Amino acid sequence: MTDQSLSPESGETPTHAGFVAIVGKPNVGKSTLLNAFLNTKVAPTSPRPQTTRRGVRGIYSTDTQQIVFVDTPGLHKPKDALGKYMNQEVQSALADVDAILWVVDLRHPPTEEDELVARQVRDLPKPLFLIGNKVDAAKYPDEAMRLYRALLEGRTGETHERMLSAQNSPQAVAALREQILDALPENPFFFPRSSASDQTREQWAAEIIREEAMKRLREELPYAVATRVTNWTEREDGLQRIEAELIVEKNAHKGMVIGAGGKMLREIGQAARKQLEVFLNCKVFLGLEVIVIPGWREDEEALRELGYE
């Protein structure tokens, strides 16, 4: 993974670079924090838990420092093969990183899922940052932070604490980012300085579409939807033509995603297209199709085909 060509020439200032996992239970603000670190959108966000399904790498670089943030799925008790894959993504990230950000929600005391995260990170000999999020909406943030801190009792590794508001003020995010930069080991850069993510454009666009679907679909249906881009072409006039699929498990789900007269699918497509146009800074044609792959969340072959491997 290391590219020696990204190292400074002999005699130049040495570079520091490392991988930093962002972990926590579902829906505590991990992806929102990652996007704030980078000042751009590389990870999907929605009010629903488990929006993030795979480890998304976001890259922040200065002239001599590089953080590769790994935004992980929320650690939880899995109900299917997809859930097991998501937990494996977390465990794999923790094994390979140089530092850990554990994000907790200060509006609530620790839950069983928080305890599960604490057990994963407590004994790891890596710098750990306990991030108390949503402090502005918490009634008793100091007491909540004390309870989360207690879950790390007995930890001997380097530990830092910081509270953040739900709005992630630029000053607070920058201060935390500087603290993380100080913890990086001396290494050559892992990615070119201009990189913001290791995702392909197709993966990124598919996640934008899935985010908009999750915002609009109800009950358990959002968790039974996957997305993939099947074709992306650019016309001579600059228009980006993107074809994508929304994958569901049942014909009944297909009807719900399409909606009466196609209303739901149009809403998802219009919202996703607007996001894509803002970030791509060009006109986009987005064509969506809903297909059925029965039981895809329990089908390991289907999961691999959808990129969960």
UniProtKB/Swiss-Prot annotation:
Residues 16-186 form the Era-type G domain. Belongs to the TRAFAC class TrmE-Era-EngA-EngB-Septin-like GTPase superfamily. Era GTPase family. Pfam families: KH_2, MMR_HSR1. The gene is era. One of its GO terms (molecular function) is GTPase activity. The keyword Nucleotide-binding applies. This is GTPase Era. The keyword Acyltransferase does not apply. One of its GO terms (biological process) is ribosomal small subunit assembly. PROSITE patterns: G_ERA, KH_TYPE_2. It is found in: Cytoplasm; Cell membrane. An essential GTPase that binds both GDP and GTP, with rapid nucleotide exchange. Plays a role in 16S rRNA processing and 30S ribosomal subunit biogenesis and possibly also in cell cycle regulation and energy metabolism. Residues 217-294 form the KH type-2 domain. Residues 71-74 are annotated as: G3. Monomer. Residues 133-136 are annotated as: G4. Residues 164-166 are annotated as: G5. Residues 24-31 are annotated as: G1. Residues 50-54 are annotated as: G2. GO terms for cellular component: cytosol; plasma membrane. It comes from the Bacteria. Coiled coil: none annotated. GTP binds at residues 24-31, 71-75, 133-136.
